[in-house]
């Protein structure tokens, strides 16, 4: 009885902090900060979390989840440097925490520091080989380096674990084939993405490029028109259609599209170049030289400017 009584007395005198648990008051502070975050009051959440984290004198009591939420708050505020500082500090105390590793890796990726991003994604996979964010993050790193086959090995693992994954990943997978001019596989996989979501213009653009590569020009132009219907404000889609029509030898249609485009963007050098190319093919030599001169003068050192300058010399 004496031993049991002493044990009970000892435990009753210990704080929850001594036992490694967050005291009740602390838990309430975290919940309050989390609620602020959920209410999109990110600055207030960051203030609360900063106080919550740094009031703990013992760094071992600084919770990984609090660091993660603080970093997320800074991300929402657009303060990515601060967010990364938070994650890196947290990893000093929680070096094997997968959400923190992934969060820091993603920010390095956004900053273009791919080597550092790869290192942290590798560490995350050591702790959790099936982590979806680490697999797709590493796939994107290899894709950005141009190692498309290597990127697909990570995507293959990801799809095996997540067969109903968001179609954006299937579209990125398709783009790796497109970049290697494997148009058949690119078309197959972008069609799968479109079956899940046909409202994304970029999916239709990938489909159009794959169809062009396969020689299915009617399909390619139809897909491009769908993309333009979804995003009529996108200049890149209009320019791609202009180029596609020109490559098909449909000079009148291409010129019509070009002139319409130039009404809103009269100094677009690529559009001016294709106006000149189409006009030249249609025998409108004078206007072709005029537009070519404009294209060359806007930015002479650019690729388009150099091409226009060279053509201008040949068309004299």
Labelled PLM ranges:
Residues 11-78, 85-88, 313-316:
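N-terminal leader/linker segments that initiate helical-solenoid repeat arrays
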Residues 38-39, 76, 110-111, 144-145, ...:
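Register position in tetratricopeptide repeats
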Residues 62, 66, 100, 134, ...:
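TPR alpha-solenoid repeat register
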Residues 65, 69, 103, 137, ...:
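Canonical tetratricopeptide repeat
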């Amino acid at each position: 009885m004496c031993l049991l009584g002493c044990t009970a007395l000892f435990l009753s005198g210990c704080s929850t902090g001594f036992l490694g648990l967050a005291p009740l008051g602390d838990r309430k502070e975290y919940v309050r900060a989390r609620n602020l975050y959920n209410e999109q009051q990110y600055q207030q959440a960051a203030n609360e979390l900063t106080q919550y984290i740094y009031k703990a004198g013992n760094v071992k009591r600084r919770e990984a989840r609090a660091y993660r939420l603080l970093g997320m708050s800074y991300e929402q505020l657009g303060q990515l440097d601060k967010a990364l500082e938070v994650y890196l500090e947290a990893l000093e105390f929680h070096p094997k925490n997968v959400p923190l590793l992934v969060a820091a890796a993603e920010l390095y990726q956004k900053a273009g520091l791919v080597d550092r991003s790869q290192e942290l994604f590798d560490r995350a996979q050591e702790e959790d080989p099936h982590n979806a964010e680490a697999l797709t993050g590493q796939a994107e790193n290899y894709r950005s380096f141009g190692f498309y086959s290597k990127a697909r090995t990570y995507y293959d693992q990801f799809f095996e674990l997540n067969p109903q994954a968001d179609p954006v990943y299937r579209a990125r997978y398709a783009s790796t084939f497109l970049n290697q001019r494997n148009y058949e596989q690119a078309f197959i996989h972008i069609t799968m993405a479109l079956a899940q979501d046909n409202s994304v213009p970029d999916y239709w653009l990938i489909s159009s490029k794959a169809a062009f590569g396969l020689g299915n020009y009617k399909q390619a132009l139809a897909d491009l028109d769908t993309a333009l219907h979804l995003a009529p404000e996108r200049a890149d889609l209009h320019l791609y259609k202009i180029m596609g029509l020109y490559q098909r030898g449909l000079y009148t249609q291409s010129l019509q599209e070009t002139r319409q485009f130039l009404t809103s963007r009269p100094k677009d050098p690529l559009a001016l170049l294709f106006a000149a190319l189409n006009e030249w093919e249609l025998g409108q030599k004078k206007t072709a030289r005029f537009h070519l001169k404009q294209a060359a003068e806007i930015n002479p050192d650019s690729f388009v400017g150099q091409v226009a300058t060279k053509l201008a010399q040949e068309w004299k």
